[in-house]
C-alpha cells in the first residue's frame, strides 16, 4: 500500500463511530461514523502532532470575551445554587467552542475521554459486547451487532434493541454517543443495568449485565454454501485488529476450497481508515483506493493498492442504509474496480473525514477536516453508494431472520455467486 500526501496546513484541523462498541465495548471508534452520530470511524488520528503552541491569530478569544467570561464566572460563583467545579466549567468552555461549529461529528474530549477513545480502537475492552449507533430523533443507543459469548449475548440483547436507560440515567435526545458509551462501560466485574425497548415485541426489558474483558471480534465467517464452496465474512466495524481478522478468515475459507466470497457490511458504521485501506489492498488490483481533499480542493492524501496479493475470486458485498463511512469506501472501491457485485440498499452517505488532534494536557479535539472521493472521483457524501442489485428486506423481517430465508439480501448474494461458480 502506498500513501502520498499533498501539502497540509498545520491548523486546528476522523470511526464509524460513526458506531460505538460497548464491549468494552467501545465505539464505532477510531473513529467511525454513522448517520446518527455513531462513533467508530473514519478517523485520521494526528497522534503525536501537538497544536498547543500555535501562534494565536484568531478573533474569538479577545479582551471583551475574556472580560465577559470573568463576569459570568463571578455571577455563577455568587448566585448559582448547586455546586460545580473549575474543571467542569473549563471543560464546558472548550466543549462549547467545538459545539458552536454545529457539526455533529466535531467533539472535545477530556483527557479521560480521549484515553478511552484510544482504548476503544485497540480491539480489546472491558464491557458488555455490543456495537451501537445512535438514533438521531430520540438519542437512544441502538444495538447494531452483538459479540458472541459476551454479557450482551448471554442477556439475549438483539440487534435493533433500543437502550433507553443506563442504570438510573434516562437517555436524552441531546446526549452524545461517546457519553453513553462511557456510562455503559466501566470497571471489569462491575454491573450495569439497562432498560431496553424491543420494537419487534413492543415491550420494554430490564437487564443487568456484569462487565468483563472482551476482545472486540469484528469479524465472523463460515462456508455459506458447502457444495458450491461460497464463503461468507461479516465485518461489523473497522478497528485496529479487523484487517488481520479478515485476512485470517479469508485464508481459512480458502484452505477449505472457497470458490467465491460474500462480504457482509450491512449496518457497519465504519471505523479506522488505515484498516479499511489495508483490507482493500488485499482485495483490489493496483491503483487508487480513496483520496481526500480539503475545503480548498487540495489533495491531502491518496491511498493506493500495490496489488501484491489481490484476492482473485468472484465477490458480492452486502450493504444497507446503515453501511456508512469506511464501509462505503470499501464498497465504492470494489464496485468501481468491477471486482464485486454490490447487493442490498443504497448506503448511508458519509463521505467526510474527521481528524482527532491530541493536545498537550491529554485532551483532544475531533474536527471534520476533509472529504473522501472514490477511485473514480465520485463524492458520496449525503448520496451514498448505489447497489448493483437493489434488494430490500421484507416488512416482517426481524433480527432472528438474519441469514435465513427472509434475509432476501443474503439469499440474493448467494444466488449471484452460485451463478458465477462452475
Predicted regions and their residues:
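A generic secondary-structure signal marking the coil-to-beta-strand transition
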Residues: 126-128, 139, 205, 229-231, ...
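Cleft-lining beta-strand/loop regions that shape enzyme active-site pockets
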Residues: 2, 144, 153-155, 159, ...
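Intrinsically disordered, Ser/Thr/Pro/Gly-rich linkers and terminal tails that flank
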Residues: 2-134, 165-166, 171-225, 237, ...
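Glycine-rich active-site/cofactor-binding loop and its immediate structural neighborhood
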Residues: 123-169
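Short, histidine-centered active-site or binding-site loop motifs used for metal coordination
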Residues: 76, 147, 395
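Conserved P-loop NTPase
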Residues: 354-358, 365-397
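Flexible glycine/proline-enriched surface loops and loop-helix/loop-strand junctions
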Residues: 229, 313, 392-399
